[in-house]
């Protein structure tokens, strides 16, 4: 059985490393809450985690556009459906 490639397949190792770092950041947020640190310190760390996740998400979207849409490797083939799928993903990222 052939392995299916995704837009992130070539950088999967780096992606997993980044996600592991983000996981560590989240554990760090829990630790500073346990330590009763100043509220603004907690919020600052939460914002750092969100920024890191946003960066990962944007990288995944970039890979999706280049590999899946432009390269024609999966997803819808109709340009209108492609645009709708992409804009839906972007909308979910920015509407928190």
Where do the protein language model's features map onto the residues?
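Solvent-exposed interaction patches of small proteins and small membrane subunits
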Residues: 1-96
């Amino acid at each position: 059985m052939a392995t299916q490639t995704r837009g992130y397949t070539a950088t999967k190792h780096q992606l997993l490393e980044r996600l592991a770092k983000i996981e560590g950041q989240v554990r760090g947020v829990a630790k500073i809450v346990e330590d009763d640190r100043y509220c603004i310190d907690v919020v600052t760390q939460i914002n750092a985690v969100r920024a890191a996740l946003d960066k990962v998400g944007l990288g995944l979207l970039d890979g999706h556009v280049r590999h899946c849409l432009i390269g024609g490797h999966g997803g819808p083939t109709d340009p209108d459906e492609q645009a709708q799928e992409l804009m839906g993903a972007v909308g979910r990222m920015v509407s928190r």
